Amino acid sequence: METTPLNSQKQLSACEDGEDCQENGVLQKVVPTPGDKVESGQISNGYSAVPSPGAGDDTRHSIPATTTTLVAELHQGERETWGKKVDFLLSVIGYAVDLGNVWRFPYICYQNGGGAFLLPYTIMAIFGGIPLFYMELALGQYHRNGCISIWRKICPIFKGIGYAICIIAFYIASYYNTIMAWALYYLISSFTDQLPWTSCKNSWNTGNCTNYFSEDNITWTLHSTSPAEEFYTRHVLQIHRSKGLQDLGGISWQLALCIMLIFTVIYFSIWKGVKTSGKVVWVTATFPYIILSVLLVRGATLPGAWRGVLFYLKPNWQKLLETGVWIDAAAQIFFSLGPGFGVLLAFASYNKFNNNCYQDALVTSVVNCMTSFVSGFVIFTVLGYMAEMRNEDVSEVAKDAGPSLLFITYAEAIANMPASTFFAIIFFLMLITLGLDSTFAGLEGVITAVLDEFPHVWAKRRERFVLAVVITCFFGSLVTLTFGGAYVVKLLEEYATGPAVLTVALIEAVAVSWFYGITQFCRDVKEMLGFSPGWFWRICWVAISPLFLLFIICSFLMSPPQLRLFQYNYPYWSIILGYCIGTSSFICIPTYIAYRLIITPGTFKERIIKSITPETPTEIPCGDIRLNAV
């Protein structure tokens, strides 16, 4: 193994053509003048010393194929890096492990065959999710840019991908933080001797409110509702004051104050960059695991817990013959790991050049999947307890999905446990920290992208730009804080972001593997890590992962989800609205392709060639090294 240090300082004027020189701590390569002879078929991105097929032999400077040419741009200042390696790992884990791990995976698992679902889930993770995760970490670490400007170094015509990612991130921030606002409202309401969703004697309760756990004789009817359900729907959401999407009603000032507090925490956590957010995640990324452990032990000691675990894991192998099970497995692993959102590119761009991103991808992916699996035990031990207390089947208790599973079913179970106040406080605090990590990451992806794309405008004004982003997201969230805001949240989650980010990720995978070239990409990885990705990874990146994404997209388009929330059926026009919102993001990709071809001079063929040829090389900070296999 040969290593090349980048520590020496040389004047560019003292270098001959083709030599590697240092200026201001950044390695540069002197480019020959147009009159000089060069390799006519040389790859123009500057990363490789191996000429393209058909390259001429008449060259002034020949470079051995076993040597790596070190090339870099002259940049102002050095790029910020993580304070410690563990800061990066905790940030990535905190981003990947979010609210969906707690509510979505357990529900999907038991609905799709219980323990049998783990087979398609694992297969989809190995062949689809993890390869895409690894690809984004490697791209970000090598090119050291956000999701917009990185395409100048990969395939400029696809720069619209970066803009699409930023728009999607705004849509996600508009509804995701609202769910945290609900959790914060629950947290504040939990500081009482008796949790307010325990009884039916509150001002918001109706005559249909029936307490399962009351000592009085009760009769449960089809119209009966639990105290927890009425607290969630009539007090927190106040959804009864809205007639649907056509009449959302006013804004809940309580939720507006909650989300304002959340955005304040977000701002002061990310305003200074990854060195500050990297310290915050020491709390926000580790705290959920402490609470999950406490809740798991508590749930396991409850009567009837075994019924919930059996219901969760009992395999139904016949389910594997259904296409829907494999679709759910693919979608769950993709949205859980989170490639395609620009976050992994941003986080990895702050790594040291020789950081082992391959190992990071495997470790964080395994931690994420295991967290989802363990969260199922946390949820279903409590559901088993509720089924035992109600003398019902677990299937009757576990009918709620999505946020309702947390804010109604689990909240009701906690309210009827010993020390209910304590467990309610730590549970909703856990939900908030899970959400904060993902929000930190999502906004950092946008901030890094814009700062890298417009460094002369925003590089020294990061705090102001972060404030502008946070304020924009706050105002974008107002529509989800209305009395009918829950309808908007579900619409945005199902239609506005899901299909869009899948499409963006598919185009990104194709652009890297097919246009930039899998050989070139693997050569980049080898320069960083000293070894080249094996054939398994190459096949996944070129064929399996794109097919994996195409499979999910086609399945969604062929059988789109029928939206229903509580007793409200979404009108047909709302589905069209959802598709339009989703299209508004990834429409940036074909729009930029057309724009690029129009502004590029030359014939149409020349425009195509110039537009898919990398424009700029990658800077290697002084002090880093590239590893070259000899």
From Swiss-Prot:
Please tell me, according to the UniProt entry, what happens when changing I425L.
Found in 2 autistic individuals; increased affinity for serotonin; increased serotonin transport rate
**Catalytic activity as recorded in UniProt:** serotonin(out) + K(+)(in) + Na(+)(out) + H(+)(in) = serotonin(in) + K(+)(out) + Na(+)(in) + H(+)(out)
Q: InterPro entries, per this entry?
A: Na/ntran_symport, Na/ntran_symport_serotonin_N, SNS_sf
Q: Where is this region: Disordered?
A: 1-59
Subcellular localization, as worded in the UniProt entry = Cell membrane; Endomembrane system; Endosome membrane; Synapse
Where are the residues of the annotated region Interaction with RAB4A? 616-624
UniProt-recorded name of the protein:
Sodium-dependent serotonin transporter
Q: Where does the UniProt entry place glycosylation sites?
A: N208, N217
Gene for this protein? SLC6A4
Per the UniProt entry, the effect of F465L is:
Found in 2 autistic individuals; increased expression at the cell surface; increased affinity for serotonin
Q: Where does Na(+) 1 bind?
A: G94, V97, L434, D437, S438
One annotated GO molecular function? serotonin binding
Signal sequence range: none
Return the GO cellular component terms, semicolon-separated. endomembrane system; endosome membrane; focal adhesion; membrane raft; neuron projection; plasma membrane; postsynaptic membrane; presynaptic membrane
Fetch the SUPFAM superfamilies from UniProt.
SNF-like
Q: Which family does it belong to?
A: Belongs to the sodium:neurotransmitter symporter (SNF) (TC 2.A.22) family. SLC6A4 subfamily.
Say which domain of life the source belongs to. Answer: Eukaryota
Tissue distribution: Expressed in platelets (at protein level).
PTM comment: the record says: Phosphorylation at Thr-276 increases 5-HT uptake and is required for cGMP-mediated SERT regulation.
* PTM annotation (Phosphothreonine): residues: T276
Q: What does this protein do?
A: Serotonin transporter that cotransports serotonin with one Na(+) ion in exchange for one K(+) ion and possibly one proton in an overall electroneutral transport cycle. Transports serotonin across the plasma membrane from the extracellular compartment to the cytosol thus limiting serotonin intercellular signaling. Essential for serotonin homeostasis in the central nervous system.
Q: Which residues are recorded as binding Na(+) 2?
A: A96, D98, N101, S336, N368
Q: Which residues carry this modification: Phosphotyrosine?
A: Y47, Y142
UniProt keyword terms in alphabetical order: Antiport, Cell junction, Cell membrane, Cell projection, Disulfide bond, Endosome, Glycoprotein, Membrane, Metal-binding, Neurotransmitter transport, Phosphoprotein, Sodium, Synapse, Transmembrane, Transmembrane helix, Transport
Ranges of the Cytoplasmic topological domain:
1-87, 136-160, 272-277, 348-360, 444-463, 517-538, 596-630
Mutagenesis / variant outcome for changing L550V: Found in 2 autistic individuals; increased expression at the cell surface; increased affinity for serotonin
**What parts of the sequence cross the membrane?**
88-112, 116-135, 161-186, 253-271, 278-297, 325-347, 361-380, 422-443, 464-483, 495-516, 539-558, 575-595
